[in-house]
């Protein structure tokens, strides 16, 4: 590729594709997971690049992925709706696609929520030289920011199957550095929702919705105390009492996490409120940064013994995470129980994404 010709610097994979005679813009024929996708119809930023770099694909390359390729969408349509426009595939449609033999799962993806003023939408093409792709080169990432506006942020995407996977365990934080927004040094936090047993999560820290006296007698608090062993309750007793909305840490005992952050969401046996839940979430995030944590599991504060409405708690907690300016923290997992809780937190994250795009 010649820089003098004014073309963007492509990644090494895209360069090999060009050398082999393939096209990085014409349906991503050289990439088995992307064959047959009309990328330009769903990713304007990628279309803007591929329009100037596309060349006819070599005859040998499309055959590599012919057996696994999804049929290309017609011009101006999306496979999810078949109608004109850029409507996102529904979750049900994505799961149906994953169940079909021979269908590539990269078409059905979910965008993880991210903090900040803007997060990108669904991007099913995912080629290496797409500025919305997590594999995009820094040069093309800069180009993508200029195409999408000054508040462009790159969000990681994951397959629909992985997003909806019901699991009692999850991996710890990856060693990658945090992404930053153009024009500042504010890090993003990945937001995830999992139906999971918080006591089994292999993260840097998990949270406990506690009372001000740190007596872990019921609900999630009791489960954490049992899993952590007697040392956890002993440390809690030494640090009690704490004020409403405050947070303190203890070791995690026999659990795989390093710390348990206890956030006081109510008095012993008493109700809670939206202000307390917001303050407790913010205090938990600050404590995680103080401890140098990169990954954190949050439980639904105040929705058990506290009796606070689930949808309201999800909205308040997600909002508090979005407003937080992290130090070391890169990943927040909402560990919930039941489909209703998963829907509530997923909807709160999606609502934040929609608001950020407006």
Curated annotation (Swiss-Prot):
Note down the stretches annotated as region Disordered. 70-93
InterPro entries, alphabetically? Answer: Macro_dom (IPR002589), Macro_dom-like (IPR043472)
Biased-composition ranges for Low complexity? 70-88
Q: Macro domain: which residues? A: 178-353
List the protein's name: Uncharacterized protein Mb1934c
* Taxonomic placement: Bacteria, Bacillati, Actinomycetota, Actinomycetes, Mycobacteriales
> Which gene codes for it?
lppD
């Amino acid at each position: 590729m010649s820089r003098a010709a004014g073309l963007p610097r492509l990644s090494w994979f895209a360069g090999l594709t060009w050398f082999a005679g393939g096209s990085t813009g014409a349906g991503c024929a050289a990439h088995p997971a992307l064959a047959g996708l009309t990328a330009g119809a769903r990713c304007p930023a990628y279309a803007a690049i591929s329009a100037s770099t596309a060349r006819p694909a070599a005859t040998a390359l499309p055959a590599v992925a012919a057996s696994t390729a999804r049929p290309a969408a017609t011009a101006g349509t999306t496979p999810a709706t078949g109608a004109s426009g850029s409507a996102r595939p529904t979750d049900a449609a994505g799961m149906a696609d994953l169940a079909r033999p021979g269908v590539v799962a990269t078409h059905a993806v979910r965008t993880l929520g991210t903090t900040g003023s803007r997060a990108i939408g669904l991007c099913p093409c995912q080629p290496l030289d797409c500025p919305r792709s997590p594999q995009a080169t820094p040069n093309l990432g800069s180009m993508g920011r200029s195409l999408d506006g000054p508040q462009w942020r790159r969000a990681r995407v994951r397959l629909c199957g992985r997003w909806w996977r019901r699991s009692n365990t999850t991996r710890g934080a990856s060693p990658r550095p945090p992404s930053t927004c153009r024009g500042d040094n504010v890090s993003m936090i990945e937001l995830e929702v999992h139906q999971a047993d918080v006591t089994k999560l292999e993260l840097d820290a998990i949270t406990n919705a506690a009372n001000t006296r740190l007596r872990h007698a019921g609900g999630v608090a009791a489960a954490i105390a049992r899993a952590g062993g007697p040392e956890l309750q002993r440390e809690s007793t030494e640090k009690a009492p704490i004020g409403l909305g405050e947070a303190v840490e203890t070791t995690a005992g026999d659990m795989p996490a390093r710390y348990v952050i206890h956030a006081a969401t109510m008095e012993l046996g008493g109700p809670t409120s939206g202000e307390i839940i917001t303050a407790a979430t913010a205090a938990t995030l600050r404590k995680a940064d103080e401890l140098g944590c990169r990954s954190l599991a949050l439980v639904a504060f105040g929705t058990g013994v506290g009796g606070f409405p689930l949808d309201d708690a999800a909205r308040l907690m997600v909002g508090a995470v979005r407003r937080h300016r992290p130090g070391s923290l890169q990943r927040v997992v909402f560990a919930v129980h039941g489909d209703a809780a998963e829907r509530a937190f997923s909807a709160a994250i999606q609502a934040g994404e929609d608001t950020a795009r407006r």
